Amino acid sequence: LFLKLVREAHKRGMKVIIDGVFNHCGTRFWAFRDVIRNQQQSRYAGWFDVKRWDDPSTSQNEFTYKGWWDVRDLPEFWEGDSGFVKPVWDYFFNITRRWMDPNGDGNPSDGIDGWRLDAANEISHVFWKGWRSLVKSINPNTYVVGEIRDDASKWLKGDEFDAVMNYPYARAVVRFFIDTDSRRLTASEFDRELAKIRG
């Protein structure tokens, strides 16, 4: 159904950008469900940042894991200094190929046109550099925008993202044009905020 939407959007001259969440998943994600069921014996046990496995000899469930911003419903994928473990890396690369060139014929015209990457600053630069190489090899015109909450200069060197969501600018604009309370910026305060952003 989604690929039909992409096809119809393309017929109308529209581009489709999807939200890619590679830092964490939900508790209903198939690999995480397998980890819950099979604990250390799960073939996906190394995919997640598990802090403690359940001890079946006790009545309580000791299974704990790292959740994104401590949100238990959003288990984080385990990532070391060099990025995700290979099976996770491969999984993300495969889903990237799936949505960018759905039929795998080397022609990406039936796939999506871009990615908005959630919590991008929480994933290693090593991963993003490799991922961008894959993305641009499939379709050099793919638009890649990362969610970076603060200074994004490290991600904008031409080897990771094409753009970022500019939260500092957005916050300043909202405070100047929209806020009506004590957070509202005067014109000179707004100018100073923009100068800080420009560096």
Predicted regions: what they are:
Residues 1-108, 131, 137, 153-154, ...:
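Substrate-binding/active-site clefts of carbohydrate-active enzymes
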Residues 10, 24, 33-39, 57, ...:
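Active-site-proximal helices and loops of the catalytic beta/alpha 8
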